[in-house]
Amino acid sequence: MTYKEARVYLDEMSKYGSVLGLDTIRGLLRELGNPQDDLKFIHIAGTNGKGSVLAYTSMILSKAGYKTGRYVSPTVISYLEKIQIDGKWISESEFAEIMEEIKEAIDRLVCKGEPVPTVFEVETAMAFLYFKKQKCDLVVLETGLGGETDATNVIKNTVCAVFATISVDHLGVIGDTLEEIAQTKSGIIKPGCTVVSARQQENVRLILRKKAESLNCIYTEAEPEQMSIEEEDYKGLTFSYKKYMHMQNHIAGECQRENLSVALEVIESLRKLGYQIEEGAVRDGLDATRWAGRFTCLSEDPVVIVDGAHNEDAAKKLKTSIERYFTGEELILIMGVFKDKEYEKIVQILCPSAKRVYTVDLPNKERTLPAEKLAECVRDCMTEQMSVYAEKSIGDAVAKAYTYATEDSGKRAVIACGSLSYLSEVIRCMEGYVQNP
């Protein structure tokens, strides 16, 4: 099986639909010899910040000498970045080899009358099998959706259950209220593991703490108020947090204060469990961490930022970052959103301060809110100084935004936001401009 054939096979699986619960992936993993049972996990759930916490934590562990697997969703640059070891993506040949083994297992299951796994279940099984074959010391694992019934939650050997910020998202899918969403996500806590959480709303905190205590888990909450910022701009910050002094980080944005404090508390929890993680590894890991689509700077003149803010909480933090870093600059937004998100709130938070807004269709045609409908939503809250354009393509939006940003000596910043799903195309389209300004 070639890589192309493996991707085609995976794409074809989406037509089979899905069966709720973990029985299907358990059956697949059993057919593969339960590779997840030979691995140790740091399992991360949350609404916003999971990816950044994963990036910091896994890079620090790699710098400390632990062979560290990463499983992330969604991806930004390449499909292959979904499965990584020490920051290196799985290769096309490795992907094809693992997929062939999984296809054979699925064929055997289907012959027994078992259901076909979902795409995400197959990807998760691939990751477990790959990490076992590569003999990873630890795997930092990001949930796909929710927690308790998420395909990643088949694992048993959770060393640390981690919660990034939990807020309202995927209403009606994993819960109808914030409390129900938090309860679902708390399902990743396993008996006796350590639990680390971001600073949560009080009702969420009570749910997580109660679940942790019921399973005899030590519960630790990050304290972002103990972080002192020494230097900061749109390219990163220098900070101190508790005993970690003068640390450098190259992912900017308001939300990174919270994410950094969570990651450092995870590292402290692991140290208490006997993992050898020196301060130098923490320093080197933070300095080396890059995470595409999280307030990522593509250009400095003009400033071009891509950020995956896709819900109300993320939009508020993006707005705070914009106000902090770009006071006095004209704001140009490129925006694409999914129609099943609370996009009106994203628009109401971000768009009133913009000079121009270019709306686009997302690559996923089934879920995208059409650019024209998004433009209509923007017009409902536009000011007299704002212009709104529904573009035919992401490339057109990038070209027009960049041209306007550079047409005279005015200070302007371009921000592409609304979803992670189209940022790879923004990055690709922008490359020709920023390489030859």
PLM feature segments, named:
Residues 57-62, 131, 270, 350, ...:
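Hydrophobic alpha-helical packing residues
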Residues 133, 138-143, 149-162, 166-170, ...:
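Nucleotide phosphate-binding/pyrophosphate-handling subdomain across enzymes
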Residues 1-46, 53-66, 71-73, 107-114:
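Short functional linear segments
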Residues 109-111, 134-142, 158-243, 260, ...:
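Acidic, Mg2+-coordinating active-site environments of NTP-dependent enzymes
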Residues 201-220, 235, 303-306, 312, ...:
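C-terminal helical cap/extension that packs against the catalytic core
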Residues 72, 198-199, 211-233, 250-254, ...:
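Beta-strand->loop->alpha-helix junctions that form or flank phosphate-binding loops
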Residues 419-437:
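Glycine/aspartate-rich loop-and-adjacent alpha/beta segment that forms the canonical ThDP
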Residues 29-30, 34-37, 63-156:
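ATP-dependent carboxylate-amine ligase catalytic core
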